[in-house]
Swiss-Prot record:
Organism listed in the record: Trachypithecus johnii (Nilgiri langur)
InterPro entries, alphabetized: Protamine_P1
Tissue note: Testis.
A Pfam family of this chain: Protamine_P1
Name of protein: Sperm protamine P1
Effect of residue 28 to R: In strain: Isolate NL1
Length: 51
């Protein structure tokens, strides 16, 4: 959870905050979703949009 908040403060990009979508789409588990939070870093942004 700590990572999540940090990510939020760094940038408000969609990938950083949507916890709700994670429940809607069961393609990826919430866990995988949280990993995508790294997308705040520029490297992961593109990947993040996939989720």
């Amino acid at each position: 959870m700590a990572r999540y908040r940090r990510c939020r403060s760094q940038s408000r990009s969609r990938c950083c905050r949507p916890r709700r979508r994670c429940r809607r789409r069961r393609r990826q588990s919430c866990r995988a979703r949280r990993r995508a939070t790294r997308c705040c870093r520029r490297r992961y942004r593109l990947r993040c949009r996939r989720y």
